[in-house]
Amino acid sequence: MPTIIDKLSDALHLHSHQSTFDSKVTVIFVLGGPGAGKGTQCARLVEDFSFSHLSAGDLLRAEQHREGSEYGQLIQTCIKEGSIVPMEVTVKLLENAMTATLAERRSGEGWTDGQGRFLIDGFPRKMDQAEKFEHDVGKATAVLFFSTTQEVMLDRLLERGKTSGREDDNVESIKKRFNTYKEQTMPVIEHYEKLGKVIEIDSSVSIEEVHQKTRSAVAKLLSGSTA
């Protein structure tokens, strides 16, 4: 009997292939603990540098509920059976979103002659996801790492929880997310640090201060990558 992984692989045509995008495409992974301010800063960078902002979590949620989706039923089946959505699916959705964005033939800085600029928020969360993305889609140009203390993140998430309505914005869930981040995502950051690709930003300070530091670092990165 074929497993759910087999079914997903068949449906998504998940076969080994060369990376989809070449070095003209800038890919920045955006990582940090829950409440570190990743989404807030991504929104600012979109305005500053015309990035396309992709969230792996948002793509999965949208695909699950999209009418006519070829992946939605399979994602729902994984959830129903209590199994994790395979990394192949997440990577494929990111690849599709990037392909669709490039097909729009955007104008402006960073979007001519086959170029593109992507911020991928909250991904990769594990090393195998990083390896799969780099093999199938393309190499990461850099990793933006928003670092702060667990105390700061907890305070921010509890404050957000007062109005967000998110079930995971409570102390018990937050602590589990912290543990997952430390055990699974920190090794990803350490891996890219060894490659000299990590840009660490202290996100303990105000949103505006973090933005100024981030904008300066990304401007320097882009000027170097396009030189």
Swiss-Prot record:
SUPFAM superfamilies: P-loop containing nucleoside triphosphate hydrolases. A ribonucleoside 5'-phosphate binds at residues 61, 83-85, 122-125, 129, 166, 177. Residues 55-85 are annotated as: NMP. The keyword Cytoplasm applies. One of its GO terms (cellular component) is cytoplasm. GO terms for biological process: 'de novo' pyrimidine nucleobase biosynthetic process; pyrimidine nucleotide biosynthetic process. InterPro entries: Adenylat/UMP-CMP_kin (IPR000850), Adenylat_kinase_CS (IPR033690), P-loop_NTPase (IPR027417), UMP_CMP_kinase (IPR006266). ATP binds at residues 35-40, 160, 205. Its cofactor is Mg(2+). GO terms for molecular function: (d)CMP kinase activity; ATP binding; UMP kinase activity. Keywords: ATP-binding, Cytoplasm, Kinase, Nucleotide-binding, Nucleus, Pyrimidine biosynthesis, Transferase. Binds 1 Mg(2+) ion per monomer. HAMAP family: Adenylate_kinase_Adk, Adenylate_kinase_UMP_CMP_kin. Belongs to the adenylate kinase family. UMP-CMP kinase subfamily. This is UMP-CMP kinase. The lineage of its organism: Eukaryota, Fungi, Dikarya, Basidiomycota, Agaricomycotina.
